[in-house]
């Protein structure tokens, strides 16, 4: 299915530990480039996140951001560092014995850095939930790419219809153009008072027809239209293939323009260039 390289997705999850939000956005890029902004607690997840993205996307500049907000009320139970507390009590008693002044305040002991600490949250369990949310965010992200891709596909198909119409128009004009050119050549010879034998005249007319004959270019343009339709039906990433097809379209339209000796053909050649350029602009954003 056709996918755009421009997309955005956001997904938030909540648990007893707090909340986490994934945000993903991307723009067109020749290759796949990934950029991450992860909180310090989950910086180690970057290789896993990068690999999961690479297995599902092939092109685009992708920015991936994780916001993590722990719930203060969900902190674990307080843990007493008994060893440190005993050391502080012993030190306080020694000071009292030396000066025979002051009393030990238990609250002061508990306030001492490192004596009391909240039990750390299970970051591994939280990381598992966060990675599951990443998979869901990627699902949403790909759906957004595919939705935009279908819109791009419709625009390209409209331009392909325009190309086919211009090809048919030029093909319909060719007998008339050849006859007009024949009469023009004969008139020039008469004006120049040049008399040619019938065989020689026919040879000149054949050579002239070969120079302005665009049947091959029209055939190839029609073949390119058909092949582009086939590419648009493929399920894998097709951006590079479509870009190559636009190069082929350009080559034939340039040849058609160079052979043009008629205003109608010239106008069609110009219109073809416009249609091809419009398709190329859309294709630059296809994965």
Curated annotation (Swiss-Prot):
One Gene Ontology term of the molecular function aspect: RNA endonuclease activity, producing 5'-phosphomonoesters
Alphabetical keyword list: Endonuclease, Hydrolase, Nuclease
Cofactor(s) it depends on: a divalent metal cation
EC number(s) reported in the record: 3.1.26.-
Keyword Glycosyltransferase appears in the UniProt entry: no
One of the protein's GO biological processes: RNA catabolic process
InterPro entries found in the cross-reference section: YicC-like_C, YicC-like_N, YicC/YloC-like
Knockout consequences: In strain JSG210, wild-type growth rate and motility, increased biofilm production in vitro, decreased persistence in inoculated tomato cotyledons (cv. Tiny Tim seedlings). Wild-type strain JSG210 has high persistence in tomato plant organs; fresh produce contaminated with Salmonella contributes to food safety risks.
Enzyme class: hydrolase
Function: Probably a ssRNA endonuclease. Might contribute to small RNA (sRNA) regulation.
Protein family membership: Belongs to the YicC/YloC family.
Protein name per its UniProtKB record: Probable endoribonuclease YicC
């Amino acid at each position: 299915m056709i996918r755009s390289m421009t997309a955005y997705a956001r997904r938030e999850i909540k648990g007893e530990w707090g909340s986490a939000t994934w945000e993903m956005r991307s723009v067109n890029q020749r290759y796949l480039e990934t950029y991450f902004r992860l909180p310090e607690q989950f910086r180690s997840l970057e290789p896993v996140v990068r690999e999961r993205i690479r297995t599902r996307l092939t092109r685009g500049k992708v920015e991936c951001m994780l916001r993590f907000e722990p719930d203060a009320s969900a902190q674990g139970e307080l843990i007493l560092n008994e060893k440190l507390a005993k050391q502080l009590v012993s030190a306080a008693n020694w000071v009292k014995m030396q000066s025979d002044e002051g009393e030990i305040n238990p609250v002061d002991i508990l306030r001492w850095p490192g004596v009391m600490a909240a039990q750390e949250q299970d970051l591994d369990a939280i990381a598992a939930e966060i990675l599951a949310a990443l998979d869901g965010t990627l699902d949403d992200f790909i759906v957004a790419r595919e939705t935009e891709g279908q819109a791009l596909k419709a625009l390209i198909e409209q331009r392909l219809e325009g190309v086919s119409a211009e090809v048919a128009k030029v093909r319909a004009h060719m007998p008339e153009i050849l006859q007009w050119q024949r009469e023009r050549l004969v008139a020039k010879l008469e004006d120049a008072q040049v008399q040619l034998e019938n065989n020689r005249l026919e040879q000149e007319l054949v050579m002239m027809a070969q120079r302005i004959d665009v049947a091959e270019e029209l055939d190839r343009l029609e073949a390119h239209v058909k092949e582009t339709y086939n590419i648009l039906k493929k399920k894998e990433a097709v951006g590079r293939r479509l870009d190559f097809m636009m190069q082929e379209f350009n080559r034939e339209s340039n040849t058609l323009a160079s052979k043009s000796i008629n205003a109608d053909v010239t106008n069609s050649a110009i219109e073809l260039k416009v249609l091809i350029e419009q398709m190329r602009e859309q294709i630059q954003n296809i994965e």
